[in-house]
A protein has these predicted regions:
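Short, small-residue-biased leader/transition segments that mark boundaries at the very start
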Residues: 1-8
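Non-catalytic extracellular/periplasmic "stalk"
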Residues: 10-14
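Extended, small-residue-rich solenoid/repeat segments and analogous flexible loops
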Residues: 17, 31-38, 43-97
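Conserved alpha/beta enzyme-core scaffold
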Residues: 23-26
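A generic structural signal for secondary-structure junctions
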Residues: 56, 176, 183-184
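Structural signal for interior beta-strand "rungs" in well-ordered beta-sheet cores
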Residues: 72-179
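Short, charged, intrinsically disordered terminal tails
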Residues: 184-195
């Protein structure tokens, strides 16, 4: 219906504004809003996902698949159109990020290059990670299966997460284990990749 389309469009615009602010606030290399809007591939891939998700929810799956395919080719970022992504999200550097179909990413999350939110095999249904608010996922981390990354958690670079991560916990390693607590309640905002003990 037309009313539903208007709601989705407002959500897309709200997401764009808050994502743009997130990049400007968290990325020291972001020189301003306009360059981010025009050239940041993580930001652009995320906005393309928002459009493809809109088309998927509007029963226009062919257009959703087309946008997904083109975004993957152009930006090197693979976000399934059905993935649920909140606002104020930053995909930094972005190359090689993969976000599976049933993934859920809440508001104010920061994800770095080479991160995978994937399944563990041929299981169907709800099979991808759930990333709660304020989470920081560092470069190259792999989070596999229907696991929950608790609010304010931090996943260290190169980690392989196969189990739930408690809120406000830092995990590292292969397989990942708890190694400490983040220095803030929202590591996605402070973007501190160090491991505290």
């Amino acid at each position: 219906s037309r009313g539903l389309g208007d709601v989705y469009k407002r959500q897309i615009i709200n997401g764009l504004v808050l994502d743009l602010h997130a990049v400007k606030q968290r990325d020291p290399a972001a020189s301003g809003y306009l360059p981010t809007l025009l050239f940041s591939k993580g930001f652009l891939a995320l906005q393309t996902h928002r459009a493809s998700n809109y088309f998927l929810n509007s029963k226009e799956s062919l257009m959703a698949s087309f946008l997904h395919s083109q975004s993957s080719k152009l930006y090197g970022v693979d976000i399934h159109p059905a993935a649920s992504i909140g606002v104020g999200v930053m995909l930094d550097h972005a190359t090689g990020i993969v976000i599976g179909e049933t993934s859920v990413i809440e508001d104010d999350v920061s994800i770095f290059q080479g991160v995978t939110l994937g399944g563990t095999g041929k299981v169907t249904g709800d099979r991808h990670p759930k990333v709660r608010q304020g989470v920081l996922i560092s470069a190259g981390a792999k989070i596999l299966g229907n696991v929950e990354i608790g609010q304010g958690a931090k996943v260290a670079a190169g980690s392989v997460v196969l189990d739930n991560v408690e809120m406000n916990t830092t995990v590292a390693g292969v397989p990942a284990v708890a190694v400490g607590k983040p220095s803030s309640d929202s590591p996605a905002i402070t973007v501190d990749h160090t491991i505290e003990e």
